[in-house]
Amino acid sequence: MVRRNLQSDFVGGAFVFPGGAVDLADGGAEAESVCRGRSDAEASILLGVDSGGLAYWMAALRETFEEAGLLLAERPAGPALLAGDPEEEARFVAERARVNAGTRRFLDVCRDESLQLLVGEVHYFAHWITPMGAPRRYDTRFFVAAAPPGQQAAHDAGETIAETWISPRRALEGHRKGDFEIIFPTIRNLQAISRFATSRELLEAAEAASSSVPTIEPRVLSDGNGVRIVLPGDEGYDDVRVDRPVGVAPNFNDAVRAISRAANHDDGATAGGVSAPPLSAPPTSAPPVAEPPLAEPSEGAIP
């Protein structure tokens, strides 16, 4: 996980999975030519979109490279990528800096280095949409993948200011204690991951379920019992006012933090003890899209 810059507009200082917006260069035939293991048609079916689905995978891998320095790719012939060659590592550090600065396309790095992005090993895991009424909304697809062997994660010292490998249970416990800030969708994703004993089990389950990932669009309310999140299917979900994400917190970041502090159970319960099945199909609205992937070492246990 990486820690967001303290000056970020959205929950600065929180720990998140690497991610960001899908760029135009993430899609199209040129991008598909550097991807292996999944076609645009296959990706689009999984996401429930007409076309352009592969761009989400491309964005996830690009953002993981930009923010965490991990590159889920390989050359068709040759040694493992970034596995101890100092000259190669220095070259990719420089390429990463150029991509982050906007002077070099990630696509061009892959093409010039003869890389194939391992999109077939990255599995669609979760879909969250920011509650209606929020001043800034995100339509976010989450992915899981094994970390590439031999590579060392490193934050970018720009959008992110720290990185850590941490087990889901430790992250959730740190959140409960107040010394590891994470937000509600991250909490729920970590709760889901924590149910698996190993990364291998998680990846196998994610692959098997990737064609039926539900969309979760919470609604947030404040009443005499405090701040609560209601999910699709919960009693009162359709009655929640949507003109403000949290009635007692007009500042969006304060609202997000209040909700996330309340969601302090690691048994799947939501804030206020409300839990329910999510939607089975995406809504018709299409706010901006962000693509954070999740990653764990491929053989490591998940304590």
Give the location of each predicted region.
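N-terminal leader/linker segments that precede catalytic domains of diphosphate-processing enzymes
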Residues: 1-287, 291-303
